[in-house]
Amino acid sequence: MTTKIFKRIIVFAVIALSSGNILAQSSSITRKDFDHINLEYSGLEKVNKAVAAGNYDDAAKALLAYYREKSKAREPDFSNAEKPADIRQPIDKVTREMADKALVHQFQPHKGYGYFDYGKDINWQMWPVKDNEVRWQLHRVKWWQAMALVYHATGDEKYAREWVYQYSDWARKNPLGLSQDNDKFVWRPLEVSDRVQSLPPTFSLFVNSPAFTPAFLMEFLNSYHQQADYLSTHYAEQGNHRLFEAQRNLFAGVSFPEFKDSPRWRQTGISVLNTEIKKQVYADGMQFELSPIYHVAAIDIFLKAYGSAKRVNLEKEFPQSYVQTVENMIMALISISLPDYNTPMFGDSWITDKNFRMAQFASWARVFPANQAIKYFATDGKQGKAPNFLSKALSNAGFYTFRSGWDKNATVMVLKASPPGEFHAQPDNGTFELFIKGRNFTPDAGVFVYSGDEAIMKLRNWYRQTRIHSTLTLDNQNMVITKARQNKWETGNNLDVLTYTNPSYPNLDHQRSVLFINKKYFLVIDRAIGEATGNLGVHWQLKEDSNPVFDKTKNRVYTTYRDGNNLMIQSLNADRTSLNEEEGKVSYVYNKELKRPAFVFEKPKKNAGTQNFVSIVYPYDGQKAPEISIRENKGNDFEKGKLNLTLTINGKQQLVLVP
């Protein structure tokens, strides 16, 4: 091979590898590229002059110089990010891996799955797992921010060159209107809002790169404007999606005030949030989707929006009632928080990192410096004061907390008996989580997956079943209605009582009473009321490592933790009730599951008569399960809710009176 031929091959290869980037930046700049820019905006005088003279290349150069100066004067704004980044901290391994794999087009759209190779010529329509979240979240392009952070830390231009290429490639291959199927994933407003939120700090970190040319600047700005403007007229009808989208559109208007439409983006965002906070937040402070994890997200959304408005002196556009509602939401969160800072995994929720949650409380404490309870949670109890309540009912949302204290060894049960929820709600009224001395003995099932093809939906629906929650079923069927009515909520020094009724099935109401006795243990009375007949079951779930003993002779199940922190659940029914093991699973994080112990107390309902289940949930220290029995005294009337019972626990009697 001659030297001349070899050189031609090398030149051709370089051109081929860079073709996407060259195509993206070789297009001529025209007057139309500046249509969305407010050329009268302070700082754009040179841009305005060049545009007026028809020197569009010079105008683009001046605009790039403006943004570069702006980036040097102000740090990238991560205030609206899901997890704010600190550019002064070393790059962690996860971020570095994400950025490096992105260089070879290996992307991780969703944390619940690994990395997928999308090809040298990126296939943005590839759907490696038929989970909708994988296809949706591909277009949140979260690795772009990782690339920007690594670029900032290393100065290695390969990250900037690749990002410019990928952005142009993505924009070219995913135009609005490409197809109904593609639009459903790329242009779903939630994904658009995610990009609108993450792109401003990414832009700021890359804008000083030589790879960031004036031509690419105009391409980027026109693309960003299209996305933000589309978002402003396509908010979701309701729910947390609508909140996310409004907050992020406001952020777009704050991040790029140079756009003519930025004031409208800000105002529509503020207007939607002012309206939705009244619709979506119950008087007790809970967000109406009844999912603790999305409740926390709503708090962040409302306060991030408020912070964005403050940056441009628009905070007065939010009335005082808005701020007060958010504070009430934080107090509701505190009420249902467990001692490890987690919340129950009701309604598609999952566990969270304690330090991350404390950081959230710290950010909220800056908005509400006078609230001592928020400060207490922000500092792990080192500052501020513990809340001035223990057991608390959030009666509108139907979240009830029984609590012995605020220390790490407290006994805390959070029970759900709610009105109908939205997409994330499950048919699970009556289910609960019980946390004792640092251990969650009865974690809720969790979510596992959201939506997708038939195989994915089968996985999701398994976790939605009523029978895999700690509540009552008829013939193991899902409850048809979740519309609990609170009958009684009383708290006292030695006895807290909840009674609610839920119309779970046609012709069958489930009434559950929970008694928290001596701030230590629980008596649970379930009543199946109505004409329906079939097999009744009261289901229970335990932690995956509890290694329980199933004592069918005494109708009890007890854990065997070696540290002596144990729990017994026993049926105290006088009539025949059978104890049976069931399949149990729990999902603490997306697409990850563990087997766990589960069981049910069962008996038939043969006629219209009411059937009762009486169970005791008893924490104890040591390896020997307690001996417990019950006696109904004169005047005890389950039907009227009047209780007169004597519990005998290891030979000691405890009178239980509820008038």
Swiss-Prot record:
GO terms for biological process: heparan sulfate proteoglycan catabolic process. It holds the Pfam family Hepar_II_III_C. Gene3D superfamilies: 2.70.98.70, Chondroitin AC/alginate lyase. InterPro entries: Chondroitin_lyas, Hepar_II_III_C, Hepar_II_III_N, HepC. Its EC number is 4.2.2.8. It is found in: Periplasm. Coiled coil: none annotated. It catalyses: Elimination of sulfate, appears to act on linkages between N-acetyl-D-glucosamine and uronate. Product is an unsaturated sugar. Changing residue 295 to A: Impaired catalytic activity. Keywords: Lyase, Periplasm, Signal. SUPFAM superfamilies: Chondroitin AC/alginate lyase (SSF48230). Specifically cleaves heparan sulfate-rich regions of acidic polysaccharides. Does not act on N,O-desulfated glucosamine or N-acetyl-O-sulfated glucosamine linkages. Functions in cleaving metazoan heparan sulfate and providing carbon, nitrogen and sulfate sources for microorganisms. Belongs to the polysaccharide lyase 12 family. This is Heparin-sulfate lyase. It comes from Pedobacter heparinus (strain ATCC 13125 / DSM 2366 / CIP 104194 / JCM 7457 / NBRC 12017 / NCIMB 9290 / NRRL B-14731 / HIM 762-3).
